[in-house]
Amino acid sequence: MFDALVNGRIDTGSLRFEVEYHDIEELNRGAGLGRADISKISCAVLPAIAEHYALLDSGAALGRGNGPLLVRRAGDTRPIRRVAVPGLHTTANALMGKLFPEIEERTPLLFSRIAAAVERG
């Protein structure tokens, strides 16, 4: 997201950055606690932190072909009763609640583990 900035591809003058990488749920939690000067967050938490942070013009992870996505095992036509979400304070979870309120069982998992969990059932 901040590749050019953190990897020295643009001149930042005397500014230096200390970069930390975390799961989106941890980033959301950290922003809520004011831990970072700049952070990626889920759009769903913006109202809760807007008093302390400003939204940047770039860096969004929403759009055609990227998150949030609803996936299931190929050939499975049963009604969806439970889903894995990348955190309870994420845009994916907020949209799930609005679009599919009947799916009440939402299990938070690291984003990188969701596909394998879906495959396993």
Q: Where in this protein do the model-derived segments appear?
A:
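Bilobed "Venus flytrap"/periplasmic-binding protein-like clamshell domains
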Residues: 1-8, 22, 66-121
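N-terminal hydrophobic or amphipathic helices and topogenic motifs
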Residues: 1-61, 68
